[in-house]
Swiss-Prot record:
Region annotated Negative regulator of AP-1 activity, chain positions: 308-409
Subunit text: Heterodimer or homodimer. Interacts with CK2 and actin capping subunits (capping protein CP-alpha and CP-beta). CKIP1 and CK2 together inhibit the activity of actin capping protein at the barbed ends of actin filaments. Interacts with ATM, IFP35, JUN, JUND, NMI and PI3K. Interacts with AKT1, AKT2 and AKT3 (each isozyme of PKB), PtdIns(3,5)P2, PtdIns(4,5)P2 and PtdIns(3,4,5)P2.
Entry keyword annotation includes Cell wall biogenesis/degradation: no
Ranges where the record places region Interaction with ATM, CKIP, IFP35 and NMI: 136-308
SMART domains found in the cross-reference section: PH
Disulfide pairings: none
Chain intervals for the UniProt region annotation (Interaction with capping proteins (CPs)): 133-193
Name recorded for this polypeptide: Pleckstrin homology domain-containing family O member 1
Compositional bias (Basic and acidic residues): 331-340
Record PTM: C-terminal fragments could be released during apoptosis via caspase-3-dependent cleavage.
PANTHER family (alphabetical): PH DOMAIN-CONTAINING PROTEIN (PTHR15871), PLECKSTRIN HOMOLOGY DOMAIN-CONTAINING FAMILY O MEMBER 1 (PTHR15871:SF1)
Name of the coding gene: PLEKHO1
Segments of skewed composition (Polar residues): 390-402
Amino acid sequence: MMKKNNSTKRGPQDGNHQCAPPEKVGWVRKFCGKGIFREIWKNRYVVLKGDQLYISEKEVKDEKNIQEVFDLSDYEKCEELRKSKSRSKKNHSKFTLAHSKQPGNTAPNLIFLAVSPEEKESWINALNSAITRAKNRVLDEVTVEEDSYLAHPTRDRAKIQHSRRPPTRGHLMAVASTSTSDGMLTLDLIQEEDPSPEEPTSCAESFRVDLDKSVAQLAGSRRRADSDRIQPSSDRASGLPRLWEKPDKGATYTPQAPKKLTATEKSRCASLEEILSQRDAVPAHTLQRRAEDPPTPIPHAPGQLSRIQDLVARKLEKTQELLAEVQGLGDGKRKAKEPPRSPPDSESEQLLLETERLLGEASSNWSQAKRVLQEVRELRDLYRQMDLQTPDSHLRQTTQHSQYRKSLM
């Protein structure tokens, strides 16, 4: 026997709601539980009217006599209920009415079976529309009384009297002199509100006077701090002149003449054209006097150069011997290997080729060093011959060089 769901019944509705026609009525099968062998489905007459859902065992005209009444505001949505791998036509017509997951909601989930898939879609659309209207009706019924309005944020606030007088200049100067211990002084140039008519000083003059006072106070505080912090460790340090002890008044700055560069410094930054013009301007008797003077002996190191050449020659000879030995060893291995033109695959052959390459590079480097040393020796001998030339030939060559340079210019 079917029990009445008295817990879900609501109070009497208003007159307009009772007189309104139902949105949808019809017979559907409702899920009533599981039996021993199969599920239990029973035919029920369902009436959707407003935000109420009426379910009865037989068709009735008066909703007051219906056994089960459900408020759609307690439900979240209505959707299709279908098993993924089921081929039965019955599973294509199932739909469920899911309750909302709010605390205190005791409304049950309802499962129905429509006559056809088209009827199922019609019931789903109608129930979802009714659920939306029920939720909106709950929001529309929220009323706000006139007495509970929020107060205006700026219109009703208390007004504050702004009649406080700004601080005077003397107070600001006193605060600045006592609060600035690191030498920084803040100047706040706020003019007093009630200046006396007997002192018609302008803003610029008052600013200049305040600035002079501030600079004087700053200089005095710095002198006191420096005298307390600096203690000379010796008589020499105490005898040195101090910049902070010099009088401020009467001190004038005298620009000094730029330092004259010596001939060596000028030659460092002179251009090639200036150097050539200076050499051309040298008189002939100066060159003759320089030529008559005995040549200054230039310290040569022939023994050191010879030792370097011998060392390079020995290293070159040793490197060539090692290279010849490695090449012979590599040729012997290549002849014994079959086929002769196969690429080297063992680590020993790769190491042999790498050694041969390195020895070849070393041999070429030693040969280059030997050539460089030979050029150095030749340049040294040529320089000696130039120093031992006669003064007349030296003067003649200098004149020829100067004429050649002039012709190029």
